[in-house]
Amino acid sequence: MSKVPLTARGAEKLREELQRLKTVERPRIIQAIAEAREHGDLKENAEYHAAREQQSFVEGRIQEIEGKLSNAQVIDPAAVNAQGKVIFGATVDLVDEDSGKEVTYQIVGEDEADIKQGLVSVNSPIARALIGKEEGDLVTVQAPGGEREYEIVEVRYS
């Protein structure tokens, strides 16, 4: 399996979710299964089947997170000598050449992406267009809504 790039914040969020699933959700579901078993016939016991389905989901998510964390490559953009270039973890201020609107994005791992918070996946069209570019460069992005052109105003590594 290939390395999964994560920011330190993204890795910490995954660790917190894993901890919650193991210490809160797993015991709660085990208790729900035990209570449902006490109600008798398991074939027609909706509570039992719902709890088992939840258990399956939680155990699957635990395995998924453990796999991602074991293959994680935590990247601190401030520690990389990027010399003004856009790299994974960088925060980039852009100006849309058509509308003049300013936008700010941080390039993060798949699991961290949240466009509403300005966090774009390293595999997204905009991140792929930005990687390796520097302040002052114009980039063309093949977005779902058509081609967009942006100017890179500032690149930060925080």
Swiss-Prot record:
PROSITE patterns: GREAB_1, GREAB_2
Source domain of life: Bacteria
GO molecular function: DNA binding; RNA polymerase binding
Keywords: Coiled coil, DNA-binding, Transcription, Transcription regulation
Signal sequence range: none
One BP annotation, GO: DNA-templated transcription elongation
Coiled coil (UniProt feature): 53-73
Alphabetical list of InterPro entries matching this protein: GreA/GreB_C_sf, TF_GreA/GreB_CS, Tscrpt_elong_fac_GreA, Tscrpt_elong_fac_GreA/B, Tscrpt_elong_fac_GreA/B_C, Tscrpt_elong_fac_GreA/B_fam, Tscrpt_elong_fac_GreA/B_N, Tscrpt_elong_fac_GreA/B_N_sf
Function text: Necessary for efficient RNA polymerase transcription elongation past template-encoded arresting sites. The arresting sites in DNA have the property of trapping a certain fraction of elongating RNA polymerases that pass through, resulting in locked ternary complexes. Cleavage of the nascent transcript by cleavage factors such as GreA or GreB allows the resumption of elongation from the new 3'terminus. GreA releases sequences of 2 to 3 nucleotides.
Family membership: Belongs to the GreA/GreB family.
UniProt name for this protein: Transcription elongation factor GreA
Protein's organism: Alkalilimnicola ehrlichii (strain ATCC BAA-1101 / DSM 17681 / MLHE-1)
Gene: greA
